[in-house]
């Protein structure tokens, strides 16, 4: 990339002294509620983003005030598992140190806080540290939170898969001590000129974000093919023997720029469990060395594979890993949803999956979700498992404790709501008012939109059919809308692009059907299509497959060539 000018972020990383920048000085300044432009990029590596309340932006401008700056902090919780004691700490932070007084479960199996004033950042990070939690590398050009199927039934297999996810997360953490020095007040250690501070990442880290997931078939709740790097567990007689490795997935794109596109990962082959770290490091270092550092819109691993070619990339990964891929093993990729209600595991323990609409845990009249989870955490002896569908599993409940846990869940509105198949399979990103990238609503509007979808399905007698519906406020794709049977991507206030045709299992992308349309047009279009689907569908045919089969949209086979075509 020496012939091209590097992206600004590359210079920022190079000059940052391994992610220190002037964050400490900015934190100490009370003149403004923000950080400098450069530090706003660096703080992402520490786990948070600078935001402002866009609902108040114009009003404050008229008053000649700076925007109402706040921060969104995202924790690193590999596999989404935390203890009840940790959850109580997480809850206390939300209640005392954020203006949102809420916890947001994310589509990557962790939680985030919104509405943090700059003065509270350090206190929050130190409080998380006391709970053995952190936000290191939850954002930024590094390996993000590692997802893992929270399968509450195959407990032994889940334990083995989770151990791999946890090891991946720990092994691929940045080594810089910037986080410990700035936020935890640890002493800066003296280093020599030739000392390797970041043995995997190097001084400029990765060209762009890097997302990783471990799936346990037949479940695909982690949407493994949408990740930069995926590991699909292969078991024999209930024991983990290895993984099918996938690489090159990613959701983000830019409206109107056809050289950007979402993409599902390629299958590369089977690897043994003992070789996982070799291959993970090999894939990451190829991306580190080959990835585009001039154009951040084309810097994800998916573009590296497209630009260099599958075979060339595969050969380089094998060379760096020192191991060849074996032929991919046969596995069945199935449902992406969660199992709601009580499920008994093979170990005799029970697991209660609670639906949390759009992942927002907050006390509201008639639904005191935050208090309910707090009360459960006080007595629960198992663990809490966050899912990539923004839900919560109260896992490892003894049979004799079921009634007490269920009673608390019902008392606080965590159980008892009527949940349609489609609502249970649908997710939305945060969007307005806090996300600076949002062009339209998502989380705040989504429940009402799903009400309309439910009504249309009932009208046409297809309520029993789960349809994966996802909404985002922009095309960056945090809620993985391009892998939804019905995807809505914000284009402007109240206007969305409508995408159709993804597979129910997450093995095929969707394609744009209508551009820049409002709610009335979206619902009219879906009303017509649901009517056709009710009459014309084959036995067992999902909605996404139906829209492709009857020619409503063309199947996306090679995203680089036909997502936009």
Curated annotation (Swiss-Prot):
Keyword Iron-sulfur: yes
Residues where [4Fe-4S] cluster binds: 429, 435, 474, 478
Disulphide bridges, residue numbers: none
Alphabetized GO MF terms: 4 iron, 4 sulfur cluster binding; heme binding; metal ion binding; NADP binding; sulfite reductase (ferredoxin) activity; sulfite reductase (NADPH) activity
GO CC entries: sulfite reductase complex (NADPH)
Record's catalysed reaction(s): hydrogen sulfide + 3 NADP(+) + 3 H2O = sulfite + 3 NADPH + 4 H(+)
Reported cofactor(s): siroheme; [4Fe-4S] cluster
Pathway assigned in UniProt: Sulfur metabolism; hydrogen sulfide biosynthesis; hydrogen sulfide from sulfite (NADPH route): step 1/1
Keyword annotations from UniProtKB, A to Z: 4Fe-4S, Amino-acid biosynthesis, Cysteine biosynthesis, Heme, Iron, Iron-sulfur, Metal-binding, NADP, Oxidoreductase
PROSITE patterns given in the database record: NIR_SIR
One Pfam entry name: NIR_SIR_ferr
Its EC number(s): 1.8.1.2
Cofactor comment text: Binds 1 siroheme per subunit. Binds 1 [4Fe-4S] cluster per subunit.
Keyword DNA repair: no
Family stated for the protein in its record: Belongs to the nitrite and sulfite reductase 4Fe-4S domain family.
PANTHER family: SULFITE REDUCTASE [NADPH] SUBUNIT BETA, SULFITE REDUCTASE [NADPH] SUBUNIT BETA-RELATED
Self-association state and partner proteins as the record states: Alpha(8)-beta(8). The alpha component is a flavoprotein, the beta component is a hemoprotein.
Role of this protein: Component of the sulfite reductase complex that catalyzes the 6-electron reduction of sulfite to sulfide. This is one of several activities required for the biosynthesis of L-cysteine from sulfate.
Protein name as catalogued: Sulfite reductase [NADPH] hemoprotein beta-component
Species: Shewanella sp. (strain W3-18-1)
Name of the gene: cysI
């Amino acid at each position: 990339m020496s012939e091209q000018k590097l992206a600004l972020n590359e210079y920022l990383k190079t000059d940052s002294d391994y992610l220190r920048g002037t964050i400490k000085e900015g934190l100490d300044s009370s003149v403004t509620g923000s950080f400098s432009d450069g530090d706003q990029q660096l703080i992402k590596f520490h786990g948070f983003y600078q935001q402002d309340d866009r609902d108040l932006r114009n009003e404050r401008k008229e008053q000649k005030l700076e925007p109402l700056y706040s921060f969104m902090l995202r924790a690193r919780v590999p596999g989404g598992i935390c203890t009840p004691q940790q959850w109580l700490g997480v809850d206390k932070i939300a209640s005392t140190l954020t203006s949102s007084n809420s916890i947001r479960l994310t589509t990557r199996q962790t939680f985030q806080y919104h509405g943090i004033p700059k003065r509270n950042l350090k206190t929050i990070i130190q409080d998380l540290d006391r709970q053995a939690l952190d936000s290191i590398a939850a954002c930024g050009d590094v390996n993000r939170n590692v997802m893992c199927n929270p399968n509450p039934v195959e407990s032994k297999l889940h334990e083995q898969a989770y151990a791999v996810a946890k090891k991946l997360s720990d092994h691929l953490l940045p080594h810089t001590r910037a986080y410990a020095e700035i936020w935890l007040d640890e002493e800066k250690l003296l280093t020599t000129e030739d000392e390797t501070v970041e043995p995997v990442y190097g001084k400029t880290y990765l060209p762009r974000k890097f997302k990783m997931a471990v799936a346990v078939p037949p479940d695909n709740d982690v949407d493994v093919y949408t990740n930069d790097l995926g590991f699909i567990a292969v078991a024999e007689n209930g024991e983990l023997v290895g993984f099918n490795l996938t690489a090159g997935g990613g959701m983000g794109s830019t409206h109107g720029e056809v050289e950007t596109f979402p993409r599902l990962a390629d299958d590369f082959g089977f690897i043994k469990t003992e070789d996982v770290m070799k291959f993970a490091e090999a894939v990451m270092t190829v991306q580190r060395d080959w990835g585009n550092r001039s154009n951040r819109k084309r810097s994800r691993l998916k573009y590296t594979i497209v630009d260099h070619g599958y075979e060339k990339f595969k050969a380089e990964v094998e060379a760096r890993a020192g191991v060849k891929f074996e032929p991919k093993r046969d596995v069945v990729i199935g449902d992406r949803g969660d199992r709601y209600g009580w499920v008994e595991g093979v170990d005799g323990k029970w697991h209660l999956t609670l639906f949390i609409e759009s992942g927002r845990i907050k006390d509201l009249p008639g639904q005191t979700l935050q208090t309910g989870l707090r009360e459960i955490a006080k007595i629960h002896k198992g663990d809490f498992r966050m899912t990539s569908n923004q839900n919560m599993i109260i896992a490892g409940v003894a049979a004799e404790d079921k009634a007490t846990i269920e009673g608390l869940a019902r008392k606080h509105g965590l159980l008892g709501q009527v949940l349609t198949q489609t609502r249970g399979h649908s997710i939305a990103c945060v969007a307005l008012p806090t996300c600076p990238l949002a062009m339209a609503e998502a989380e705040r509007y989504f429940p009402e939109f799903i009400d309309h979808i439910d009504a249309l399905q009932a009208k046409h007698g297809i309520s029993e059919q789960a349809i994966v519906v996802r909404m985002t406020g922009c095309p960056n794709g945090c809620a993985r809308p391009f892998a939804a049977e019905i995807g809505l991507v914000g284009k402007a206030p109240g206007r969305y692009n409508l995408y159709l045709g993804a597979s129910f299992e997450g093995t095929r992308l969707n394609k744009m059907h209508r551009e820049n349309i409002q709610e009335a047009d979206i619902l009219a279009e879906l009303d017509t299509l649901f009517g056709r689907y009710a009459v014309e569908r084959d036995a067992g045919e999902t909605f996404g497959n139906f829209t492709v089969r009857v020619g409503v949209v063309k199947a996306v086979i090679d995203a680089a060539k036909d997502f936009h075509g």
